[in-house]
């Protein structure tokens, strides 16, 4: 349930700080600062994601920034912390951070695609979950921006439809519009 998930997340964050506190003292401030900024960015990205659920006018640039904050910065932070602790030059650590951001963006965009077109046995979760829950994904934002008037009205009708009994029909109809 949601309360257990929140408590588990809080516990993992505290444990992560405990482990980070064991770093060499000469690297500790830089590592803790980066980790703290990253944790705050992830929260900001999650807030954007929740805000986007109430909007049908999310721009692609807003979406990319949301997934950068929600997903990419975690991978970027991990790579940069590894570089810092290994004693890499700042330029290399920053390049690894940027690489992590880009890999994180690619991961999330691929996840959006696989949620529509993937094989649930390979993907590890049901296909169409983002459509069913009206997640503002790259696929939906792109479809809304390229749709003609008729297609846009149909997409908006399906987005407004919260009838769980129509879920599979909704997934099929929205997927057809993506195609």
Residue ranges of model-derived segments:
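All-alpha prenyltransferase/terpene-synthase fold signal
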Residues: 1-179
């Amino acid at each position: 349930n949601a309360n257990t998930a929140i408590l588990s997340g809080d516990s993992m964050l505290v444990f992560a700080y405990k482990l980070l506190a064991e770093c060499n003292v000469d690297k500790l401030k830089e590592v803790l600062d980066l980790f703290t900024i990253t944790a705050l960015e992830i929260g900001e990205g999650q807030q954007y994601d929740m805000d986007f659920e109430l909007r049908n006018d999310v721009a692609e640039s807003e979406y990319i920034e949301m997934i950068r904050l929600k997903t990419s910065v975690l991978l970027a932070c991990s790579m940069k912390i590894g570089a810092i602790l290994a004693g890499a030059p700042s330029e290399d650590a920053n390049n690894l951070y940027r690489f992590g951001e880009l890999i994180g963006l690619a991961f999330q965009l691929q996840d959006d695609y696989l949620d529509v077109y993937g094989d649930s046995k390979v993907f590890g979760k049901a296909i169409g979950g983002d459509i069913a829950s009206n997640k503002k994904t790259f696929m939906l934002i792109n479809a809304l921006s390229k749709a003609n008037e008729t297609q846009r009205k149909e997409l908006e009708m399906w987005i407004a439809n919260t009838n769980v009994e129509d879920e599979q029909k909704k997934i099929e109809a929205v997927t057809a519009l993506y195609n």
